[in-house]
C-alpha cells in the first residue's frame, strides 16, 4: 500500500491553495465543503474566486507565492500551470511538515486527492494512487450509481437513533437486523428527504416495534427493453439488494450480470403461445419466497405494468398481505422507437400513441375502426404472429395501405434489427423477423431515414 487512506477534519483550520484558475477552483470547492478556513494565492483569479471572497468564504492573496503563507496551515495544494512553482510550494510545505498535494504530479506530493462519493456523513473515496485517474473516476461513477442519493440523510438519522436502538435490542445480532431494515426502508428515506417529521416518527416506531422475524417483500422492477444502460438507478439498487431474483427471457444477460452475486436466480421465461412457467406458478414462487422473509425482486423486461402482468402478480401478494413496491422501467415502445429513430408523437403526424397487445383472442376483438384513424401512432406488443391479421383489419377499417410500418427486433440491444415498409407489406415483413419484436404503425415511421441514429453508431 503506497498511500494510507485517511479522512481529515479541516473545519475552521487554515488551508492554502496556490493557483487561481479552473483546477484550483475545483480543489477550493472541496476544501470549502469540508469547512476549511481557506486562503488562495495567485497572480490572478478567475471570477468564481472573487465571488467567494466577496461572500466572505475565503481570503485572496494576490501576488507571488510567499512561504510565510504556510506558517499557520494544516494542509496545502499547489494547483498552478507552473511546474517549478508547484515544486517550490511542495518543498516549502514539506520543510514545515505540512501535507501538500501537487495537481497532476503525485510524485511531488505528500498526499493525493481521491475520487469522492459524497453522501455525508457517509463518504467513499476511490484512488488509483495517481497511476490511473480515469480508472478511479470510472469506478467512482459505478459506485455512485449503486448508492442511493438519500443515503446520507439515512446515515445521519441512524446516528441519532443509536442510543435508543442499543436500549431496545439486547444483542448485536438483533441490532444488526434492525439496521438492515432501516437502511433499505424507502418510506423512511423519502420522509427524511421531505422533512416529514410525522412520517419519520411513524416509520421509525414501526421499524423499532416490528418483530425481527418480519415478512419478506417483493419488488417489481422494470428492466427496460434490453440495453443495460437503460436500467434505472433505483432498479439497479434493488437487484443489488435482492435475496431472490425471479426473471424472464426478456431480461438481458448484461442486466443479469448486475444482480447481486449470491442472490438466488429463478428463471420463469415465457414466449408467445408457450409458457415455461404458468403465471399462477410464478405468483406462488413470489409468495413462497417472500413468506420465507426474503427480499424478492421480480425482474421484468420493459415496464412491469405495461403488458407485464405486474398487476396480476401484485394482487396475489396483496391478498396474502405481503409487502410490495414497484420500480417502473422504460417500456419497449419508448426504448425501441427511440433507438430506431421513430418519434412516437410529432406535431405534424401523431397527436396520440396507442399501446396494444398483439395477443388477439377470440371474443376480445379490438376497436379497429378507432385504431385505423389518422394522426396517431400504433405500437403492437407481441404482435409478430398476428401481423397479417393486424394488416387485414386495419385496411378493412380504412387505414391506407401505404401507411408506414416498422418492426423492431431486439430493440435497444447491439443485435437490434429494424425493417420498414408499408401496411400492405406488414404480414410479409413479419415473416423475416423473430421475437421479441415490436410493430410500429403510423406516419412517424417515415421519419426513420432521417432520424435513425443508433444503427449509424
From Swiss-Prot:
Example GO biological process: siroheme biosynthetic process
Annotated Pfam families: CysG_dimeriser, NAD_binding_7, Sirohm_synth_M, TP_methylase
Region ranges (Precorrin-2 dehydrogenase /sirohydrochlorin ferrochelatase): 1-204
Cross-referenced InterPro entries: 4pyrrol_Mease, 4pyrrol_Methylase_sf, 4pyrrole_Mease_sub1, 4pyrrole_Mease_sub2, CobA/CysG_C, NAD(P)-bd_dom_sf, Siro_Cobalamin_biosynth, Sirohaem_synt_dimer_dom_sf
Annotated catalysed reactions: uroporphyrinogen III + 2 S-adenosyl-L-methionine = precorrin-2 + 2 S-adenosyl-L-homocysteine + H(+); precorrin-2 + NAD(+) = sirohydrochlorin + NADH + 2 H(+); siroheme + 2 H(+) = sirohydrochlorin + Fe(2+)
GO molecular function: NAD binding; precorrin-2 dehydrogenase activity; sirohydrochlorin ferrochelatase activity; uroporphyrin-III C-methyltransferase activity
Involved pathway(s): Cofactor biosynthesis; adenosylcobalamin biosynthesis; precorrin-2 from uroporphyrinogen III: step 1/1; Cofactor biosynthesis; adenosylcobalamin biosynthesis; sirohydrochlorin from precorrin-2: step 1/1; Porphyrin-containing compound metabolism; siroheme biosynthesis; precorrin-2 from uroporphyrinogen III: step 1/1; Porphyrin-containing compound metabolism; siroheme biosynthesis; siroheme from sirohydrochlorin: step 1/1
Residue numbers binding NAD(+): 22-23, 43-44
Region (Uroporphyrinogen-III C-methyltransferase): 216-457
Xref: CDD domains: SUMT
Positions bearing Phosphoserine: 128
Residues holding S-adenosyl-L-methionine: 225, 301-303, 306, 331-332, 382, 411
Keywords of the record: Cobalamin biosynthesis, Lyase, Methyltransferase, Multifunctional enzyme, NAD, Oxidoreductase, Phosphoprotein, Porphyrin biosynthesis, S-adenosyl-L-methionine, Transferase
Active site: residue positions: 248 (proton acceptor), 270 (proton donor)
EC numbers for this chain: 2.1.1.107, 1.3.1.76, 4.99.1.4
Domain of life: Bacteria
NCBIfam families attached to this UniProt entry: cobA_cysG_Cterm, cysG_Nterm, PRK06136.1, PRK10637.1
Function: Then it catalyzes the NAD-dependent ring dehydrogenation of precorrin-2 to yield sirohydrochlorin. Finally, it catalyzes the ferrochelation of sirohydrochlorin to yield siroheme.
Family: In the N-terminal section; belongs to the precorrin-2 dehydrogenase / sirohydrochlorin ferrochelatase family.
Protein name: Siroheme synthase
Gene name in the database record: cysG
Amino acid at each position: 500500500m503506497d498511500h494510507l487512506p485517511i479522512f481529515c477534519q479541516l473545519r475552521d483550520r487554515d488551508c492554502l491553495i496556490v493557483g487561481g484558475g479552473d483546477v484550483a477552483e475545483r480543489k477550493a470547492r472541496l476544501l470549502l465543503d469540508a469547512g476549511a478556513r481557506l486562503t488562495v494565492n495567485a497572480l490572478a483569479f478567475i471570477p468564481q474566486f472573487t465571488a467567494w471572497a466577496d461572500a466572505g468564504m475565503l481570503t485572496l492573496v494576490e501576488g507571488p507565492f510567499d512561504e510565510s503563507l504556510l506558517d499557520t496551515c494544516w494542509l496545502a495544494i499547489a494547483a498552478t500551470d507552473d511546474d517549478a512553482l508547484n515544486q517550490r510550494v511542495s518543498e516549502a510545505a514539506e520543510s514545515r511538515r505540512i501535507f501538500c498535494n501537487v495537481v497532476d504530479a503525485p510524485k511531488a506530493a505528500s498526499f493525493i486527492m481521491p475520487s469522492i462519493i459524497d453522501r455525508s456523513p457517509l463518504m467513499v473515496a476511490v484512488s488509483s494512487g495517481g497511476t490511473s485517474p480515469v480508472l478511479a473516476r470510472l469506478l467512482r461513477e459505478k459506485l455512485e450509481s449503486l448508492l442511493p442519493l438519500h443515503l446520507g440523510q439515512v446515515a445521519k438519522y441512524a446516528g441519532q437513533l443509536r442510543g435508543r436502538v442499543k436500549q431496545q435490542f439486547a444483542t448485536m445480532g438483533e441490532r444488526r437486523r434492525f439496521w438492515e431494515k432501516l437502511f433499505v426502508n424507502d418510506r423512511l428515506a423519502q420522509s427524511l428527504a421531505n422533512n416529514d417529521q410525522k412520517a419519520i416518527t411513524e416509520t421509525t416506531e414501526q421499524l423499532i416495534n416490528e418483530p425481527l422475524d418480519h415478512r419478506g417483500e417483493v419488488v417489481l422492477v422494470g428492466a427496460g427493453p434490453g440495453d443495460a444502460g437503460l436500467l434505472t438507478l433505483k432498479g439497479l439498487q434493488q437487484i443489488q439488494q435482492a435475496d431472490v431474483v425471479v426473471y424472464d427471457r426478456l431480461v438481458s444477460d448484461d442486466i443479469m450480470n448486475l444482480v447481486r452475486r449470491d442472490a438466488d436466480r429463478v428463471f420463469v421465461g415465457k414466449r408467445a403461445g408457450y409458457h415455461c412457467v404458468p403465471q399462477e406458478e410464478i405468483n406462488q414462487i413470489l409468495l413462497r419466497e417472500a413468506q420465507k422473509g426474503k427480499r424478492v425482486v421480480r425482474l421484468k423486461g420493459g415496464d412491469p405494468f405495461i403488458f407485464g402482468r405486474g398487476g396480476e402478480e401484485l394482487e396475489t401478494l396483496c391478498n396474502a398481505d405481503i409487502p410490495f413496491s414497484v420500480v417502473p422501467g422504460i417500456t419497449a415502445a419508448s426504448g425501441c422507437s427511440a433507438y430506431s429513430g421513430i418519434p412516437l408523437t410529432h406535431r405534424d403526424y401523431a397527436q396520440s400513441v396507442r399501446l396494444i397487445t398483439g395477443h388477439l383472442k377470440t371474443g376480445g376483438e379490438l376497436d379497429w375502426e378507432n385504431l385505423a384513424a389518422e394522426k396517431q401512432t400504433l405500437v403492437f406488443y407481441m404482435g409478430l404472429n398476428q401481423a397479417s391479421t393486424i394488416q387485414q383489419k386495419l385496411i378493412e377499417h380504412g387505414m391506407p395501405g401505404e401507411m408506414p410500418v416498422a418492426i423492431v427486433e431486439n430493440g435497444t440491444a447491439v443485435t437490434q434489427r429494424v425493417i420498414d415498409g408499408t401496411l400492405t407489406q406488414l404480414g410479409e415483413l413479419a415473416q423475416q423477423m423473430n421475437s421479441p419484436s415490436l410493430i410500429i404503425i403510423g406516419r412517424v415511421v417515415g421519419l426513420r431515414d432521417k432520424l435513425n441514429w443508433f444503427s449509424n453508431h
